[in-house]
Amino acid sequence: MLGPKLAEAGHELTDVERAEKPSFDGQDVAIDFTRPDAVRPNVERCLDAGIPCIVGTSGLGPDDLAALDAKAKDKGVACFVAPNFALGAALMMRFAGEAAKHLPKAEIVELHHEAKLDAPSGTAKATAELLPGDVPIHSVRLPGLLAHQEVIFGGLGQTLTIRHDTISREAFVPGVLLALQHLPTLPPGVTVGLESLLE
């Protein structure tokens, strides 16, 4: 799904992992949407080769991000990491941060397909970091779902729900294209969050 959309936008996608003789020769950027257990070694290999990276795989913790940041700075390349590449999800996070200034009591409910490996999701954890206090996160894994998140705020006599629903993985393509557009202008090191690229 990502390959054809990148090709439509004028980019060429090469699957280095599946190549007969894996090589980074001629590669401008590495994009990782793999698994939590593979993402850090994948990105470290790319950074060691001086290849800037875009990472959309959940599962990188603070220690992982710190190690990747140090390596990217050492190699003088940018590494962009986002818990979610859907523009609507980035806006949901931004709006939730704004709402929390006025309604500080909140809980997060995130719902994903049953094959999702992490719970809570990276998006839910990143959203919780934007809100004051220790925000409870409720995770649901069921067939029939793709990716959904709502932030429910409660105040005196009222509630506010900010919700984002991903109904197709195509929702991630504009965010990846935005990251590709901004990657050459990012400083060496790790930059986190699609919202940092939204004007």
Regions found by a protein language model. Give the residues of each.
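C-terminal substrate-binding/catalytic lobe of Rossmann-fold NAD(P)-dependent oxidoreductases
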Residues: 1-24, 37, 101-199
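Short acidic/histidine-rich motifs immediately flanking catalytic phosphotransfer sites
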Residues: 23-31, 47-53
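Glycine/charged-rich beta-loop-alpha catalytic/anionic-binding loops adjacent to active sites
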Residues: 27, 51-52, 73-81, 155-162
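Glycine- and other small-residue-rich loops at beta-strand/loop junctions that grip anionic moieties
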Residues: 31, 57-58, 84, 116, ...
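Conserved NAD(P)H cofactor-binding loop of Rossmann-fold oxidoreductase domains
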Residues: 34
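Rossmann-fold NAD(P)-binding glycine/threonine-rich loop
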Residues: 37, 41-44, 48-49, 57-81, ...
